[in-house]
Regions:
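Short C-terminal tail/terminal secondary-structure segment
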Residues: 19-27, 120, 255-273
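Substrate-binding pocket helix/loop in short-chain dehydrogenase/reductase
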Residues: 121-123, 127-135, 224
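C-terminal substrate-recognition "lid" of short-chain dehydrogenase/reductases
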Residues: 235-261, 266-267
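Conserved glycine-rich cofactor-binding loop
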Residues: 43-44
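Short, small/polar-rich loop/turn modules that mediate ligand/substrate recognition or access, typified
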Residues: 197, 202, 254-256
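Catalytic loop of short-chain dehydrogenase/reductase
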Residues: 154, 161-198, 210
Length: 273
């Protein structure tokens, strides 16, 4: 039976039917099945932990890093693709996306994880070079990588996801460039989420508290950290579970959110007795 002109017009103007995904219905180890995910800074710490978790959940993952030898070693260990990338070199990002598309066959999700903190102890210790290094890696690079990736995420995915790894320092009073970059990321996430919701792309950030990684210098075997409300640092595996949920189809209504994972530490900072 031929469709009437009215039905054809209605198909064009009506939104597609909603697919409700219940997380309990998704098979264990398949919550990200078939998703093609880029994880920047995937050679250690939280990036490596997330990449492994995504692979374990059925995703086709590509990690990036600057140390090619380490990058290939980690990729081999967790069973994913790898491409060298220095986010500070924004002129290489278009070529990187082209190479990633060849390896993955498309892009469904981008995880902007790579970052650097110089942990300056005082304002007078912040240098021009150090400031620029943190801005380039933590903000400028992810900004333009997302710009290059979004058209492909929109084109190739039923529900695209972009996830930024922010920090609790983006929600606190601080002079350090690292915190400034994370505050900017939080603003960017909300702006992009509003702009791209019409294209069925969800954009969020995870804002972890102090986590046991090489960046913080905390050993996973000794998580004691008295400045967190629960007296300990967090494991990268804990943050990776949140990331897995946010990339899964069960989180399709969540966008423009900064998911803070620090046991209400930053809430406590604003709490008045």
């Amino acid at each position: 039976m031929k469709k009437s002109l009215f039905n054809k017009i209605m198909e064009l103007i009506m939104p597609p039917p909603v697919k409700v995904v219940k997380i309990s219905y998704i098979s264990p180890d398949a919550r990200l099945k078939g998703k093609r995910i880029i994880v920047t800074g995937g050679t250690g710490g939280l990036g490596q932990t997330m990449a492994k978790r995504f692979v374990d959940e059925g995703a086709h993952v590509l990690i990036t890093g600057r140390n090619v030898e380490k990058l290939n070693k980690v990729a081999s260990e967790i069973g994913c693709e790898a491409l060298e990338l220095d986010l500070a070199k924004v002129e290489t990002l278009s070529g990187f996306i082209s190479s990633a598309l060849k390896k993955l066959g498309g892009i469904d999700c981008l995880v902007n994880n790579a970052g650097v903190s110089l942990h300056e102890k005082a304002l007078e210790l912040v240098t021009f070079d150090g400031f620029n290094q943190q801005i380039d890696t933590n903000l400028r690079g992810p900004y333009f990588l997302t710009q290059k990736a979004l058209p492909h995420i929109i084109k190739n995915s039923y529900k695209g996801k972009v996830l930024f790894i922010s920090s609790e320092t983006g929600d606190t009073v601080d002079f350090r460039p690292y915190g400034l970059t994370k505050a900017a990321i939080n603003s960017l996430v909300q702006g992009l989420a509003h702009l791209y919701s019409q294209y069925n792309v969800a954009i969020n950030a995870i804002s972890p508290g102090v986590t046991a990684t090489a960046m913080t210098g905390i050993n996973p075997d000794n998580l004691h950290y008295p400045y967190n409300p629960n007296g300990r640092a967090y494991l990268p595996e804990e943050i990776a579970e949140v990331a897995t949920y946010l990339l899964s189809d069960a989180s399709n209504t969540i966008s423009g959110q900064i998911i803070t994972c620090n046991n209400a530490k930053t809430v406590n900072a604003r709490w008045k007795e």
